From Swiss-Prot:
This is F-box protein At3g27290. Gene3D superfamilies: Ribonuclease Inhibitor. It comes from Arabidopsis thaliana (Mouse-ear cress). Residues 16-105 form the F-box domain. PANTHER family: F-BOX DOMAIN-CONTAINING PROTEIN (PTHR13382:SF84), MITOCHONDRIAL ATP SYNTHASE COUPLING FACTOR B (PTHR13382).
């Protein structure tokens, strides 16, 4: 079925009827206020963003600390609940995941030179020779599971630095379990040869732990700290600065995922430390869409970080483009060529296609941000 886009770009009343599926009976609902509880969500998002930017200055000193929960969001309580859930449901996660829990507990309770000790992990049988051909193609989760099968596989995996040069902890339940100590023990297996480290969602990693890992792996060139909630912008910049001064900094590309808030001065220093340019020309930048950037672990072009200066608010942030060929925002502002390029605070985007949700004050009162085109497609599938 072909979608009539002209009809979808109709009035706000038609949009409310289409979303609610009320047809002619939707007139009674269209008259409802857009913000019945006076929450003023748009201004709240801007206030939160401004607060973070204003309070990032001068936080390098230990005397300056942020409040535990400035907006009463109870983030730490939520994280503790998630962690407790994993502890309580270990038996229901599966055999492979249980092996990973055992392997991770080995990181906590043993040193790297304890390989000769007796253990109950599979006995002393010899593994098939074919495993030597398979191991280089396994991912981290599979390698950790193979390691607890038998003693010979543990020796093969633990004593081969090649298997640990690229460590990806993103999209794994391990990200809620890894601490500074266990991460350091894990990276030591590469004998200082870690090249790529993805810590996406590792909520237990602190500034101190990250500094230890970076200092012990001077050849690490690619780092992702997306979702590392215990890291601070000031601590990260300070770590990179110290390693740079001692000529031990190997990081060339950094992915933040928008989890850290940088001031303009911090963003400029970050680019200098990583050897990049804070003012990358638009012609040198490929388009980035909101839907394809949520869990990516790569950097296109030659940029050193996923952050840019937003053309609207002129603050360092994740900047996205609009995938729509025709957008109502184009031509309405002095910088028409880049009017669809902005951070998610300045321009809210559809969570399904990434297009602009302009004129947010006239949107229905809901938290499921979707454009009318995606709503129409979703209704046709019902």
């Amino acid at each position: 079925m072909e979608v009539n886009y002209e009809r979808l770009r109709g009035s706000y009343n038609d949009y409310r009827k289409l979303e609610l599926g009320l047809g002619e009976f939707g007139d009674d609902f269209v008259g409802l206020p857009d913000d019945p509880f006076c929450m003023n969500i748009r201004s709240t998002l801007n206030s939160i963003s401004d607060w973070f930017h204003e309070n990032q200055i001068g936080l390098v000193s230990e005397d300056h600390t942020l409040p535990e929960d400035p907006f009463c969001m109870r983030v730490r309580s939520t994280l503790n609940t998630i962690s407790d859930w994993f502890h309580e449901n270990q038996k229901e996660i599966g055999v492979v995941d249980q092996m990973l829990f055992e392997t991770l507990s080995w990181f906590y309770n043993n040193d790297d030179d304890d390989g000769d000790d007796d253990d109950d992990g599979g006995g002393g049988g010899e593994a098939h020779d074919a495993f030597e051909l398979v191991l280089p193609y396994l991912e981290l989760k599979e390698i950790l599971a193979v390691e607890v099968v038998c003693r010979s596989l543990r020796d093969s995996v633990g004593k081969e630095p090649f298997f640990w040069t690229s460590i990806d902890l993103n999209d794994s339940f391990l990200q809620y379990r890894v601490t500074d100590e266990s991460l350091l023990k894990l990276t030591r297996r590469a004998l200082g040869g870690v090249r790529c480290l993805n810590l996406g969602g590792c909520v237990g990693i602190t500034d101190y732990g990250l500094k230890q890992v970076l200092a012990s792996n001077p050849h690490l060139t690619k780092l992702s700290v997306s979702g590392c909630l215990r890291l601070s912008t000031a601590g990260l910049v300070s770590t990179l600065r110290d390693l740079k001064s001692s000529n031990r900094l190997g990081v060339k590309s950094l992915i933040t995922g928008g989890a850290l808030y940088f001031t303009k001065e911090q963003f400029k220093e970050l680019n200098l430390l990583l050897g990049g340019d804070a003012k990358v020309g638009l012609q040198e930048r490929k388009k980035r869409f909101y839907t394809s950037c949520r869990s990516e672990f790569y950097l296109e072009d030659d940029r050193v970080t996923d952050l840019e200066i937003c053309p609207w608010c002129e603050k360092p942030s994740l900047v996205f483009d609009c995938p729509a060929d025709t957008c109502p925002l184009k031509g309405q502002y002095p910088y028409s060529k880049s009017s669809c390029r902005a951070c998610v605070v300045c321009i809210e985007r559809c969570h399904e296609c990434g297009s602009c949700l302009n004129d947010c004050e006239n949107k229905p009162f809901c938290f499921a941000f979707s454009c009318v085109v995606c709503i129409e497609k979703r209704s046709n599938r019902l």
